[in-house]
């Protein structure tokens, strides 16, 4: 069973046995080859073993299976970073942020990737910045002296190479085209080398001057050719386009006034006059959409897409038609299945042109489809039955089977906090701590007064040796159920472990593990890099009197306590 193999893989990953995790994820993928989460998890395991090429392959497969899942881009960026492909890592994280602009993991990854790019460009060629970014091509295209060079493939190849590796500029400086381009990019005029042979100009001092008495002969101006008259057919076509454009403007004005019937008349006239501009069709489709005539809107959008591809119209115009079609389909949707063609239309639109509005509409449609599915599937009675089946398997210690029934119970009733609590316990038994923690937190979110939710969450934290966090969770549960013995016993266990660490009674292995875990905590990292705290730690070792003064500061004392809990500082 794929879920069982996945749970075993997650458990191995949590314990740091990445090779075993990879084996279990591979087994799960063989059973469920279209499950994007499995490829994502295996990518993370490969990356943990510094097998970045394999991690990259799995990350790409993740995105292929689920293009709009942000974690896939996070995996892709991490793999590129591991392979020192910093620019590609930046691109991957940015694509992920297009999908989910608020994703903190992607933001953090992007910052790391950009920092790596900056470090890789340390001590750059003094002219390197001039060749970076798309502005280079814009400047070369707009300057008459370099515009023609862009038609020469060897020149384009040289400039692309310099963009990739600015230090290679020295290899091409003998090429006058590169020198000319450098002058344009730096806004500096380089003096060209003197012409050779017959092309050399004669200095004025050596030239014979004409006698002042000889009259200057005025050159006869060549007659300029008269402009050729436009071909009648071309002229008619131009006139038709102008006429159609005016009709479109009249339609736009009517649309702004909410005079939809008049707007449709003008757009229809424009379509009859000029069928080579699909904007008339998409505009009429927009009017039909406002009027609630969704079938007519979809018909116009289909025509616009078909005609746009025939004419090789701008991708943005084709994407607009597909987005409008998707919007009309969502308006007509009455069940989860009705959202499928709308989602397909939005996905095709994004293939033509990535647009934030279209992406938002796609996410909304997928969310609505899921809500409809849950609504149609919602049955609390069947959910209770599935939960009881899960309980039976749990008692028999058949945890993967129990998880299967708890998952079905949650699908039948997403608000069943007990199903989340029981599934959290099953995941914990399998060693799948991240999943267990997630379910326990969801249980608490659904019912903050349910004490089992707190004990489930704290049990995971205790297992992970996060004793301070576990104690906070137990205490939060006691606020709702002060006499709960399981929560009270949990607090005692946490206090024992914390005191044991504070007394320095840990074995060298336990201390090393605790310190390693503590160093992964961003808060601990910030404390250790704080100049003030570094001075405090130095005084604790070398200047006891100064240390006593520091201890009178509550903020400093709180930070010291955190370092003690993490095993970084030991008080003897």
Curated annotation (Swiss-Prot):
It is found in: Cytoplasm; Nucleus. One of its GO terms (cellular component) is nucleus. Phosphorylated. Residues 133-172, 521-560 form the STI1 domain. GO terms for molecular function: Hsp90 protein binding; preprotein binding. TPR repeats lie at residues 2-35, 37-69, 70-103, 244-277, 279-311, 319-356, 358-382, 383-416, 418-450, 451-484. Keywords: Acetylation, Chaperone, Cytoplasm, Nucleus, Phosphoprotein, Repeat, Stress response, TPR repeat. GO terms for biological process: chaperone-mediated protein complex assembly. A motif (Bipartite nuclear localization signal) lies at residues 241-258. Disulfide bonds: none annotated. The modification Phosphoserine is found at residue 167. Gene3D superfamilies: 1.10.260.100, Tetratricopeptide repeat domain (1.25.40.10). Residues 189-248 are annotated as: Disordered. Residues 232-248 have a biased composition (Basic and acidic residues). SMART domains: STI1, TPR. PROSITE patterns: TPR, TPR_REGION. The tetratricopeptide repeat (TPR) domain, forming a carboxylate clamp (CC), mediates interaction with the highly conserved 'EEVD' motif at the C-terminal ends of HSP90 and HSP70. Co-chaperone that forms a complex with HSP70 and HSP90 and preproteins (e.g. chloroplast preproteins). This is Hsp70-Hsp90 organizing protein 1. It comes from Arabidopsis thaliana.
